[in-house]
Amino acid sequence: GISCEACHGPGQQHVDRQISLAAMPDKDRKQALASEPLSIIQPADLDHKRSTQVCGSCHGMKWFDKSENWTEEGFSYRPGDDLSKTTPIIQPSKANEQKWLKPILEKNPEILDDFFWKDGKIRVTGREYNGLLESPCHQLGTMSCVSCHSMHKSNPNDQLAQGMRTNQACLQCHKEMSDDISAHTLHTTNSAGSNCYNCHMPHTSYGLLKAIRSHTIETPDIE
């Protein structure tokens, strides 16, 4: 499980401030709220890359540097930081650029096969950040995890935000397709074949007693 600080960062300063505000007269409290920035991180207010990194710090296939005392001290990443500066994320598509990966592959040439399919897609459950990093929706657009997911106002099953089990998840960006979705899908509107994610986010891994969808979000390719 996770706690508030996993997504919102260290909270002691925030808690102390709220206690202080509660003791203030209304007038002083309003002035303090207007003049002092919040000391807590709100992932939805970050840019789409930093916001996604908050989730990716747990939901990414990362490599642990044994020289760090992470078993005793935890990871140095904190929400709002640049995850790429502290946490190596294994990406087969960038294996040649990830110099730290070379000695690992020399020691175990098949290690990527343990975590990824032959096409580079993640095969381990709960590591959807790896898929999203490869998605044009994230690379070229502004899609983040919170584009579709909500941690507080959702059903715990998949934690999808309201309406995100439908094509609205994709149509919030691809508005030009909303008037005639079947012209794109070639299937009857509201049918399973006309659901965007059934083609662009197929089930590619299994875990948590169910199949998990790919988050690479790409055009289907039979090859």
Write out the residue ranges for each language-model feature:
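Primarily the internal scaffold of c-type cytochrome electron-transfer domains
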Residues: 1-223
